[in-house]
Every structure is written in C-alpha cells, then in structure tokens.
Amino acid sequence: MKSMNRSVQSPFLCSSSLSRRPLCSSPLFFSSLLPFSSSTMPTSFRKVLAHGTTMLDVVYRNLSNEVSFFLQQLKEKWFDHAADHEKFLGLDLEYPANQRGVAVIQLCFARHVLIFQWARSDKNCPELMEFLRSGITFASVDIRNYKLKMRHSFGIEIPAGCLVDLQTIFRLRHDRTSMAHMAVALIDESYGDMKTSFPKSQHRLWEKGPLDDINIEYAAKMHTFHTSCTARFESSTMASVTLRNVDILI
C-alpha cells in the first residue's frame, strides 16, 4: 500500500519538516492562497489541538469555488511534486440528521485539514468529484458505508484499490478495533473519549451553517486519526517496530 511522509510539502505548510520545525502561527498564510478577500467569504482558519502539543491547521469552507481553488493549489504545490509513496490523503464524511446523504467532507494531509460543508454549498463542485476519483489513495474507516454514501450523494465511485480501510491494516489484540480504541493504541490516550465527549445532539447539526466550533474541532480530530494511523503504520513498518497490543495485518 502507499503511505504518507509527515514531512511532505502542502499548500498549508509553512515549514519544510513537520517533525523538526515549528508550524506557522498566523492564518494569513492560509488566506494568501485564496483569490478572494477573507472578509467577503465564509471561510475560517484556525488551529485545533489534536493531542499533547500537536496542533492542526484547519480550514473550514462552504463555497464550492473556494474548494476548487484549494484542490488546484494542492495538486500544483504538493501532489504533482510528491514521491509516489507520499501520495496518501485522509478522507472522512459526516452525515446529516437523516443519515441519507453527506453533510461534510474532510480531506487531511499531515497536520492540515480541509473541512468542506457540502450541505451548505451549492453542491456543484466537479473539481472535487474528479479529485476523489482521480486515482489518489485515501485512508479511512468504514469504507463500505462511505462508498455507498458517495455513490448516493455524488454519483461517483472511488477507483478500486484507492480507498484503504484502516481496520483491515490494524487489529487490536485485547480490544475491538473501533476508531477510538485504535487511536488510543496508535496515537495518544486522550483519544479514548473522542466519541463519548462529543454531545450526541451535535451530530444532528452537521447541516447547520456555519458549523459550531465544537463540530469543527471534532471533525478535525476525527479526520486526522486517519493520517496519523497511516503515518504510524509507515514508521513502524520501515523501522521494524512492534506496536504494543497491535497486529499489523498486511
């Protein structure tokens, strides 16, 4: 399978190595990527604490033309210049209250998260649809349901072999392999309550515009789980490290 290098360059990245240099602290870098004034568009830039001292750079948007520009920057500034083994993104979906479609789409690479509120957009973003089925490899959990949701909501299929289910890579020896249990074993113990600490009432608000701060933070942390686990898989495999209480299945 393909894996992701933590030091890969991205349109959001101000330093050349996430592991050795500090991330930028100003949202001005984010807005400099956009062809619009940040005062005239419903876009927010923020930092979210994932765990410990690990900060996430998060962009929240609900305009399709902004997402199109982001994907163009992503391709030109990062994807086209990355090595094959670095072309790996996290993919996550949040659902509306009736569970019949997609409310929010998240893309993540390294510590940088795009949250696109599909439910509040004009639902006309062919560039995003093309990006999803362009052959890029995505990491996720519960991919069978995701495939059904994308087929129903977008009428698209991510190519076979381009959507990797992390639950087929990792198996916990003493716990069921849920997202929370995997995050505790592979990333940090603080992820143990990431599901239960998020109020159930907020799950009904993924279509609310703008999203509440708690929803944005939850989406960012949940989504970064995918790329963090992928990076952990890569580092442990390359270094022949045995993960405590975790079996690597491939």
PLM regions: where:
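Acidic two-metal-ion nuclease catalytic site recognized across multiple nuclease folds
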Residues: 220-221, 225-250
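Conserved DEDDh/DEDDy metal-dependent 3′-5′ exonuclease domain
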Residues: 57-73, 84-89, 95-232
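N-terminal accessory regions of nucleic-acid-interacting proteins
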Residues: 2-14, 18-89, 166, 239-250
